[in-house]
């Protein structure tokens, strides 16, 4: 949160690009509803700027950015655009409903990008910088210009482009480490030199956008801020292209915990960080690694006897921040089959979930069903239950029942009943193992050519009655979708996860085809 002692010149603007750069991570595509939910969450937690998508990329992206712009409360809603007129105009149309909108236009400036990607010479690129920013500025006063592959751009040319972009009306200048090549000292020097060299640098806010290919995205981001940048572009959980982006939770807490060395502040409500991490993880079906800084399951866990002894005497011996500051509770209320609706609603609110009355009722019904099968229900069980409900609410293919016969002899056999666009279908299939039989059953019921890229299982909680959480990734025609599902029965969880990914593929293809040419769920190939 903001520190009243520190001045506005020390304030760092948080620019979240989870919905744009984060979604570009292979397999991390989110549904329309998931994007709206995440945007509202980011707005509530104090994110200054939400980059909601790339409007020209698809009708689905345009619709998501446009709807987020309509619903925004406090955050600036930003759309990404290439340097072409068509891109910029489409972006402007998408963000128009926002109380405050921004066009973020970019152009490659490094020699390798200009030669092989753009096939343009430096003068052509320079002129396009001016024309693109000028066109964007005609739509809105808030224009950000990015020099793609800025850290590999020749310094003099970079300064020339930055000066021209500011002169054309850009109010924010982003110099990204697009390929995660820079080291902190180098990135610090780059920002320092550019700000000292460009004569009109004081007329724009400088921004950092760091990728994590060498594991230095957060360190580079903080180096840029120390050199005068006042905007950090980041994502929840650090998701993004290739090795990802700087993680929002890490840059925010670095400034808060080490304010002695990083005397800057931001407006983020840090108590919402853990919840935000779980929401994004559920939407993308990308598990958060256990040892992930700030929001990982083990971030505040201590197993070593020496560490435990120190913690019991004084938590500060091994913890540099209080768990509560990032939304981690010290104790969890264990719920079970005797818990009522009121206690369940209280637990949802305590965990940070804001659901409609219909969503609460649906979740409570599934909670009671789970409680009949499991002795104790932990917070992690409820998170998995809510995640599954949010994802499956609009599924066209739904699991009604599953029966599997398995043993040491002969092929395993699965019998499955599905609801496909309102029509009930039943199929029986064999396989080399129970999971193979289940997936073969789905392929018989819903013919498709999707390739299974990932099948992963882990326990949500401890104990023999723990829920199994299964992750499945399917790819087809250049599209890759991941889904997760949890159930005390591993085979049921496997079927739900596979169907979840298949539903996402169907929905994605629907959005990609021309209006009036809907895709059939029963013929996903």
Swiss-Prot record:
<keyword id="KW-0432">Leucine biosynthesis</keyword>
<feature type="binding site">
    <location>
        <position position="21"/>
    </location>
    <ligand>
        <name>Mn(2+)</name>
    </ligand>
</feature>
<keyword id="KW-0464">Manganese</keyword>
<feature type="region of interest" description="Regulatory domain">
    <location>
        <begin position="398"/>
        <end position="525"/>
    </location>
</feature>
<dbReference type="InterPro" id="IPR036230">
    <property type="entry name" value="LeuA_allosteric_dom_sf"/>
</dbReference>
<feature type="binding site">
    <location>
        <position position="245"/>
    </location>
    <ligand>
        <name>Mn(2+)</name>
    </ligand>
</feature>
<dbReference type="Pfam" id="PF22617">
    <property type="entry name" value="HCS_D2"/>
</dbReference>
<keyword id="KW-0028">Amino-acid biosynthesis</keyword>
<keyword id="KW-0100">Branched-chain amino acid biosynthesis</keyword>
<dbReference type="InterPro" id="IPR013785">
    <property type="entry name" value="Aldolase_TIM"/>
</dbReference>
<comment type="function">
    <text>Catalyzes the condensation of the acetyl group of acetyl-CoA with 3-methyl-2-oxobutanoate (2-ketoisovalerate) to form 3-carboxy-3-hydroxy-4-methylpentanoate (2-isopropylmalate).</text>
</comment>
<dbReference type="InterPro" id="IPR005671">
    <property type="entry name" value="LeuA_bact_synth"/>
</dbReference>
<dbReference type="InterPro" id="IPR050073">
    <property type="entry name" value="2-IPM_HCS-like"/>
</dbReference>
<feature type="domain" description="Pyruvate carboxyltransferase">
    <location>
        <begin position="12"/>
        <end position="274"/>
    </location>
</feature>
<dbReference type="GO" id="GO:0005829">
    <property type="term" value="C:cytosol"/>
</dbReference>
<feature type="binding site">
    <location>
        <position position="209"/>
    </location>
    <ligand>
        <name>Mn(2+)</name>
    </ligand>
</feature>
<comment type="pathway">
    <text>Amino-acid biosynthesis; L-leucine biosynthesis; L-leucine from 3-methyl-2-oxobutanoate: step 1/4.</text>
</comment>
<feature type="binding site">
    <location>
        <position position="211"/>
    </location>
    <ligand>
        <name>Mn(2+)</name>
    </ligand>
</feature>
<dbReference type="InterPro" id="IPR002034">
    <property type="entry name" value="AIPM/Hcit_synth_CS"/>
</dbReference>
<keyword id="KW-0808">Transferase</keyword>
<dbReference type="InterPro" id="IPR054691">
    <property type="entry name" value="LeuA/HCS_post-cat"/>
</dbReference>
<dbReference type="Pfam" id="PF00682">
    <property type="entry name" value="HMGL-like"/>
</dbReference>
<comment type="subunit">
    <text>Homodimer.</text>
</comment>
<protein>
    <recommendedName>
        <fullName>2-isopropylmalate synthase</fullName>
        <ecNumber>2.3.3.13</ecNumber>
    </recommendedName>
</protein>
<dbReference type="GO" id="GO:0030145">
    <property type="term" value="F:manganese ion binding"/>
</dbReference>
<dbReference type="Pfam" id="PF08502">
    <property type="entry name" value="LeuA_dimer"/>
</dbReference>
<keyword id="KW-0963">Cytoplasm</keyword>
<comment type="similarity">
    <text>Belongs to the alpha-IPM synthase/homocitrate synthase family. LeuA type 1 subfamily.</text>
</comment>
<dbReference type="InterPro" id="IPR013709">
    <property type="entry name" value="2-isopropylmalate_synth_dimer"/>
</dbReference>
<dbReference type="GO" id="GO:0003985">
    <property type="term" value="F:acetyl-CoA C-acetyltransferase activity"/>
</dbReference>
<dbReference type="GO" id="GO:0009098">
    <property type="term" value="P:L-leucine biosynthetic process"/>
</dbReference>
<dbReference type="InterPro" id="IPR000891">
    <property type="entry name" value="PYR_CT"/>
</dbReference>
<dbReference type="GO" id="GO:0003852">
    <property type="term" value="F:2-isopropylmalate synthase activity"/>
</dbReference>
<keyword id="KW-0479">Metal-binding</keyword>
């Amino acid at each position: 949160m903001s520190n009243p002692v520190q001045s506005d010149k020390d304030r760092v603007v948080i620019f979240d690009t989870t919905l744009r750069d984060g979604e570009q991570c292979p397999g991390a595509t989110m549904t329309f509803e998931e994007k709206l939910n995440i945007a509202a969450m980011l707005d509530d937690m104090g994110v200054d700027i939400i980059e909601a998508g790339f409007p020209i990329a698809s009708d689905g992206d345009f619709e998501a950015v446009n709807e987020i712009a309509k619903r925004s409360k406090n955050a600036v809603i930003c759309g990404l655009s290439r340097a072409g007129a068509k891109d910029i105009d489409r972006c402007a149309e998408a963000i128009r409903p926002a109380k405050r909108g921004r066009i973020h236009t970019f152009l490659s400036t490094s020699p390798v990008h200009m030669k092989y990607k753009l096939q343009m010479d430096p003068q052509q690129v320079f002129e396009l910088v001016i024309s693109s920013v000028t066109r964007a500025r005609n739509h809105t006063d808030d224009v950000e210009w990015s020099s793609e592959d800025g850290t590999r751009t020749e310094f003099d040319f970079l300064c020339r482009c930055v000066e021209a972009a500011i002169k054309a009306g850009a109010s924010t200048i982003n110099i990204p480490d697009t390929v995660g090549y820079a080291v902190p000292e180098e990135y610090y020097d780059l920002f320092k030199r550019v700000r000292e060299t460009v004569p009109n640098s004081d007329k724009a806010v400088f921004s950092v956008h760091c990728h994590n290919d060498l594991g230095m995205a957060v360190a580079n981001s903080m180096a840029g801020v120390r050199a005068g940048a006042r905007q950090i572009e980041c994502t929840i959980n650090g998701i993004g292209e290739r090795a990802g982006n700087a993680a929002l939770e890490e840059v925010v807490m670095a400034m808060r915990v080490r304010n002695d060395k990083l005397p800057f502040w931001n407006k983020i409500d840090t108590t919402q960080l853990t919840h935000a991490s779980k929401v994004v993880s559920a939407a993308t079906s990308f598990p958060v690694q256990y040892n992930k800084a700030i929001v990982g399951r083990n971030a505040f866990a201590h197993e070593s006897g020496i560490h435990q002894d120190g913690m019991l005497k004084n938590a500060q011996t091994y913890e540099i921040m209080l768990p509560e500051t990032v939304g981690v509770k010290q104790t969890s209320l264990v719920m079970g089959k005797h818990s009522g609706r009121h206690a369940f609603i209280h637990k949802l609110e305590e965990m940070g979930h804001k659901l409609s009355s219909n969503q609460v009722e649906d979740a409570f019904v599934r909670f009671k069903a789970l409680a009949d099968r499991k002795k104790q229900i932990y917070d992690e069980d409820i998170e998995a239950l809510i995640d599954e409900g949010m994802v499956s609410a609009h599924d066209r293919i739904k699991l009604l029942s599953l029966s599997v016969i398995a043993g040491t002899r002969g092929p395993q056999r699965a019998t499955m009943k599905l609801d496909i666009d309102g029509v009930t279908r039943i199929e029986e299939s064999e396989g080399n193992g129970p999971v193979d039989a289940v997936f073969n059953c789905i392929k018989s019921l819903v013919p498709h050519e999707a390739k299974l890229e990932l099948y992963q299982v882990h326990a949500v909680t401890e104990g023999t009655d723990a829920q199994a959480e299964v992750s499945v990734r399917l790819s087809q025609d250049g599209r890759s979708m991941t889904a997760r599902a949890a159930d005390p029965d591993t085979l049921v969880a496997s079927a739900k996860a596979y169907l979840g990914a298949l539903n996402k593929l169907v929905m994605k293809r629907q959005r990609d085809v021309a209006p009036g040419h809907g895709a059939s769920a029963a013929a996903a190939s």
